[in-house]
């Protein structure tokens, strides 16, 4: 990914953890790309590959190559140095 790439949030519209993660990004004005794995089957396969066969959401892939799966709000705060 290029230096100006955005994090990619893979999730579903019905998942509370996904909604919470997206709300965190929105409230902190962090740009991201949203991918609904219920609509994008290839993305769903990627999430399964990342998570050992599980469709764990949200799965967030960052431009630096790091990945957070089902992160807590605190995990996201630490990732972005937000207290």
Sequence positions of predicted segments:
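Non-catalytic, surface beta->alpha helical segment in thiol-disulfide oxidoreductase systems
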Residues: 62-83
């Amino acid at each position: 990914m290029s230096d100006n790439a955005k994090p990619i949030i893979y999730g579903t519209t019905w998942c509370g953890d996904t909604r919470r993660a997206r709300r965190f990004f929105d409230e902190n004005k962090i740009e991201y790309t949203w991918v609904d794995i219920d609509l994008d089957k290839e993305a769903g396969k990627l999430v399964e590959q990342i998570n050992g066969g599980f469709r764990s959401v949200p799965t967030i892939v960052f431009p630096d190559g790091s990945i957070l799966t089902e992160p807590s709000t605190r995990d996201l705060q630490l990732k972005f140095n937000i207290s």
